[in-house]
Amino acid sequence: MADPQAGSAAGDWEIDVESLELEEDVCGAPRSTPPGPSPPPADGDCEDDEDDDGVDEDAEEEGDGEEAGASPGMPGQPEQRGGPQPRPPLAPQASPAGTGPRERCTPAGGGAEPRKLSRTPKCARCRNHGVVSCLKGHKRFCRWRDCQCANCLLVVERQRVMAAQVALRRQQATEDKKGLSGKQNNFERKAVYQRQVRAPSLLAKSILEGYRPIPAETYVGGTFPLPPPVSDRMRKRRAFADKELENIMLEREYKEREMLETSQAAALFLPNRMVPGPDYNSYKSAYSPSPVEPPSKDFCNFLPTCLDLTMQYSGSGNMELISSNVSVATTYRQYPLSSRFLVWPKCGPISDTLLYQQCLLNATTSVQALKPGASWDLKGARVQDGLSAEQDMMPSKLEGSLVLPHTPEIQTTRSDLQGHQAVPERSAFSPPRRNFSPIVDTDSLAAQGHVLTKISKENTRHPLPLRHNPFHSLFQQTLTDKSGPELKTPFVKEAFEETPKKHRECLVKDNQKYTFTIDRCAKDLFVAKQVGTKLSVNEPLSFSVESILKRPSSAITRVSQ
């Protein structure tokens, strides 16, 4: 019975649709479709009706009885071709079918009745599943009321959005009538409604694309905990949704703050201001605007944070320059120097040069401010053979006591230190075995001696300003130290001993100028230091800044006096 009815229904509806098209002038064709897979009806009219239905549910429920009697045709049973009147045997089924779970609005034989039924809203959930159901009185009995398919979820989100918009328009209309529409209240309420509308739209988009929304990631990948922004401008910028712009602004903000910290921290090189090398590399790669090339292999695992804060703004050349030149002046074991320390800053910003000079001055004065009697800090760091020769050189303040072997205990006199030079055991300050190819071709000893003599004469005749004077004296010493490990002749000892003697007078003059800085550095560097620790025979010297700065030497005392 169902098949012939379906076939006759299809033909019957075609005839009704054509006749109704002639009758309607503007409204359009009736939207009643067969119960099979149906094309989606016009959403414009239905959406408005659905909105009114979503807001006014009373109007939706008020006509349950009307629908059963209003439609002469039976819902759920299409009429046959010949008879405009419904079949008498099936007439008693009209009232229960009107309240059943499945309702189908079909045009009746009359001209006005089908037009009225075609304009009634249809259930969007039923339409998603190929069924056309009149929405009036259908909400409670919809078969797909709790369906969780993608189409039905999209319908729910659309209904929420439309309901929020309708509520906003109604509230604005009532406020305009009462004359209470203040701008502040409007903005607050509008923000609330927009916030309600925005989240469902994201959910609807995710439903359309076939996936659920992912929880929002933490800032910068979630792997890097960052301090909050430091300015009101950045806090306001965080309100925008542009993540790339936020990253750029945050990077600029952190650079400005780090430059301020650098200018404050560069006053003293404290031993505890150290950062592990891997942390520095990851930090630099995370915040640098351009891809950063990894540091050269002659850099060790530790870098002072005072230098790190500026290395990320300059190129690799400036980074090597600042680190190597400061290490020449202060003998930081963390900077194995390459032969490129003669290079001066490239065409970078002026802040690099100023920072370098300030770091050089402060680091040099901090080494000169060492008190007698301070102890070596022992650590289990091993001496690496691959370090370059300049790393193992001490500045001219040590007065030639550059070769320090492992003995049962450290002797504080200069003669004892020089007497143990013949011990074959290697120490932290002994020349390393050069098992790597030199970066730059080594010059002859005569050429280097000539350069040393020339620099020493210029340094004696024309005393440089306060910033440049320490570097030139140490620059001179380092050139002599370069030739020592390579030649390995008795002349090495003579070169080490002669150079400090030549520049002792210059250093004494410098120390008189640095008196005010020495007092300040001495207070900060030796607050919690102990005295009297001795070295064991088998424990190597540490390559940390603490061990260098806590060096007890009568030579340093003699020079500083």
UniProtKB/Swiss-Prot annotation:
| Bias-annotated ranges (Low complexity) | 68-84
The record's DNA-binding region positions are: 123-170
Q: Which UniProt keywords apply?
A: DNA-binding, Metal-binding, Nucleus, Transcription, Transcription regulation, Zinc
- Pro residues bias: start-end ranges: 32-42
Q: Which GO terms describe its molecular function?
A: DNA-binding transcription activator activity, RNA polymerase II-specific; DNA-binding transcription factor activity, RNA polymerase II-specific; identical protein binding; metal ion binding; RNA polymerase II cis-regulatory region sequence-specific DNA binding
Region described as Disordered: 1-119, 414-435
List the SMART domains. Answer: DM (SM00301)
One GO cellular component this record assigns the protein to is: chromatin
Q: Where in the cell is it found?
A: Nucleus
Q: In which tissues is it expressed?
A: Expressed in testis, kidney and skeletal muscle.
Q: Kindly state a single biological-process term from the GO annotations of this entry.
A: regulation of somitogenesis
| Acidic residues biased stretches | 13-26, 44-67
* Its biological purpose: Transcriptional activator that directly regulates early activation of the myogenic determination gene MYF5 by binding in a sequence-specific manner to the early epaxial enhancer element of it. Involved in somitogenesis during embryogenesis and somite development and differentiation into sclerotome and dermomyotome. Required for the initiation and/or maintenance of proper organization of the sclerotome, dermomyotome and myotome.
Family affiliation: Belongs to the DMRT family.
How does this chain assemble? Answer: Homodimer.
Q: What is this protein called?
A: Doublesex- and mab-3-related transcription factor 2
- Where does this protein come from, organism-wise? Homo sapiens (Human)
**Source species taxonomy:** Eukaryota, Metazoa, Chordata, Craniata, Vertebrata
Gene that codes for this?
DMRT2
